[in-house]
């Protein structure tokens, strides 16, 4: 079931984020993610609109949208991958926003391919100084302006 996240659930959400982000980004030192917990907890989550996928009273995935349009996080528990949870969460936020953008590590091919399958397209590239990794900037929907 998808529902809005409640701030009292910060502990389980952070635990899911840390486990999932370490699993999804083996090319980044694990210590970086541990050092980022406070920023996620104190800055990003309070500023975001977040929806969770809950199953058997446990959060199995979540999506957070910052600044009304930027997908700052989409994570699914490693034990719940490939069950449609990520797709359902993306579909949920698409119902709330006319367009969305996100940034994904270029080396995270599974995520890049997932976002492509959800209709996102690469618009630009960027560099993350903190992780020393290149990223793709992706957007949904793709520009639908008709050619004349």
Task: Describe the residue ranges of each PLM region.
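A short beta-loop-alpha structural element at the N-terminal edge
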Residues: 1-15
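Conserved acetyl-CoA-binding loop-helix of GNAT-fold acetyltransferases
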Residues: 76-78, 82-95, 113-117
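Conserved beta-hairpin
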Residues: 48-61, 66
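Conserved catalytic-core motifs of GNAT/GCN5-like acyltransferases
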Residues: 103-105, 121-137
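Conserved GNAT-fold acetyl-CoA-binding loop/helix
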Residues: 15-40
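Conserved acetyl-CoA binding element of GNAT-fold acetyltransferases
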Residues: 66-79, 101-103
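A short helix-loop-beta-strand connector motif used in the catalytic cores of GNAT acetyltransferases and
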Residues: 41-52, 70
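Conserved GNAT acetyl-CoA-binding A-motif
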Residues: 95-107
């Amino acid at each position: 079931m998808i529902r809005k996240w409640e701030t009292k659930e910060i502990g389980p959400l952070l635990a899911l984020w840390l486990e999932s982000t370490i699993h999804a980004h083996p090319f980044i030192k694990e210590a970086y993610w541990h050092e980022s917990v406070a920023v996620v907890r104190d800055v990003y989550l309070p500023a975001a609109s977040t929806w969770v996928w809950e199953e058997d009273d446990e959060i199995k995935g979540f999506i957070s949208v910052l600044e009304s349009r930027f997908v700052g996080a989409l994570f699914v528990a490693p034990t719940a991958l490939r069950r449609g949870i990520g797709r359902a969460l993306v579909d949920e936020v698409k119902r709330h926003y006319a367009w969305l953008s996100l940034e994904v590590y270029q080396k995270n091919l599974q995520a890049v391919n997932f976002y492509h399958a959800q209709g996102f397209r690469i618009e630009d590239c960027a560099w993350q100084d903190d992780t020393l990794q290149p990223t793709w900037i992706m957007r949904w929907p793709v520009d639908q302006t008709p050619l004349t």
